[in-house]
Amino acid sequence: MDTKVIQIGDRKIGGGNPIAIQSMTNTKTEDVKATVEQILRLEKAGCEIIRCTVPTLEAAAAIREIKKQIHIPLVADIHFDYRMALAAIENGADKIRINPGNIGSTERVKAVVDAAKERNIPIRVGVNSGSLEKPLIEKYGGVTAEGIVESALDKVHMIEDLGYDNLVISIKSSDVLMCVKAHELLAGKTVYPLHVGITESGTVNSGNIKSAIGLSLILSQGIGDTIRVSLTGDPVEEIKSAKLILRTLGLRKGGIEVVSCPTCGRTQINLIDLATRVEKLVEDYPLDIKVAVMGCVVNGPGEAKEADLGVAGGIGEGLLIKHGEIIKKLPEDQLLPALKEELDHWS
């Protein structure tokens, strides 16, 4: 889907730019030290845009100091009180996220739009299924994809009527199929970049599955310019999942893909532990390769040869395979160090 280019800090989204990975801090924003520490961890994991909640003037004031210590654009998340938006903009937020429907009167929305316009920072218009207006619920006989889209476009038109079009849209639902349908409907009705995610998707286990299904169905249609995998847990897990989803869909390169067999009665090494340790090992390598971890000598060598680098287990030992060729036979406890050495000197 062709969308217009929007600048968020030093990051461009839309218009064919790479899909940006976002997350949101779960610290108290006014706790600058804790918030910065978390953002730096997220940056290291691959986060490209960060959102922070701004429920108080203290949180808004903290944005100025936080931005001095981080390296990615910061989005201020605003609900209900338009003064928080004004303060966040004043303190250097790179983008603000609002739902004009809960900000208050048109005059208050205009004040926010005017402040954003003065600094030329984008506004993300966010609508969730849980905040759908009663008239739209009555019109469509419940919370529906059609109602979510109409709500979002109404708010976009409100801001356009105030003379501003530096906008991003997000429409979210915890209902995966409703969320997918809403994005399909919206994509044909707007040129603004879309921030995509399944809201309130759950814990790392359930949330990853729901997000992978929903985001894949949306992104595979060419819809979406930024994404967030919303999880109940450490936000760093959101980044890991988002990167894997994009890589799996062929929308992003870089980062090592680990494949491993599901184990069976033929498994001859502690494969579950080894595969887990390999996944942890490769997190910080920027290599665009595939690493295979296989548990037995029946299928292991053949399947590992399809990867760039791999191990195939035997009884207390294993084979190290590179570019399809067996290069070493090692005791089990030496497989991981040998794998690391190959990665450190990859060619």
Spell out what each predicted region is.
Residues M1-M24, K117, K280:
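N-terminal amphipathic alpha-helix/helix-capping segment at the start of soluble metabolic enzymes
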Residues I19-T25, I50-C52, L74-I78, I96-I98, ...:
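Hydrophobic faces of well-ordered beta-strands that scaffold small-molecule active sites
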Residues R83-R124:
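Hydrophobic or amphipathic alpha-helical targeting/insertion segments
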